[in-house]
């Protein structure tokens, strides 16, 4: 961590096809080993699949809705107090909320059984818009953990 000043967040340029910044961030999450062209192909392929399944509905809107549904509101952090560890529920910052939701959607899509990653991602995004799927399960699990440890919320950071 720098001592002198706060390091500014880098500005991410919107994606070339839809002009959406969130989509561009998600592209960077999907990308592995600097292969952005492959990540681009996967995401645009998934959005095409969504458009095919729901004609007339904007695929970018469906993507944004899926991301917003998966965003966690609270999470637990370990805090050591008097020789024992407590799982303390804390509110998630907006930037981390977005990052976690994108990461969880990617991981849930990877675990699916469909043939191509584009198809897996499309199905995971569709399920997330409907409030189900692997990423939603992960979010609910995190929320349950926070709810179960609500008694320790007075150990705030």
Curated annotation (Swiss-Prot):
Pfam families: Ribosomal_S7 (PF00177)
Example of a GO biological process term: translation
Gene Ontology terms: cellular component: small ribosomal subunit
GO molecular function: rRNA binding; structural constituent of ribosome; tRNA binding
Signal peptide positions on this chain: none
Keywords of this entry: Ribonucleoprotein, Ribosomal protein, RNA-binding, rRNA-binding, tRNA-binding
Source species, domain of life: Bacteria
Keyword tRNA-binding part of the UniProt annotation: yes
SUPFAM superfamilies per record: Ribosomal protein S7 (SSF47973)
NCBIfam families, sorted: rpsG_bact (TIGR01029)
Function of the molecule: One of the primary rRNA binding proteins, it binds directly to 16S rRNA where it nucleates assembly of the head domain of the 30S subunit. Is located at the subunit interface close to the decoding center, probably blocks exit of the E-site tRNA.
Family affiliation: Belongs to the universal ribosomal protein uS7 family.
PANTHER family reported in the protein's UniProt record: RIBOSOMAL PROTEIN S7 (PTHR11205)
Quaternary structure and interacting proteins, as annotated: Part of the 30S ribosomal subunit. Contacts proteins S9 and S11.
Protein name: Small ribosomal subunit protein uS7
Species for this entry: Albidiferax ferrireducens (strain ATCC BAA-621 / DSM 15236 / T118)
Gene encoding the protein: rpsG
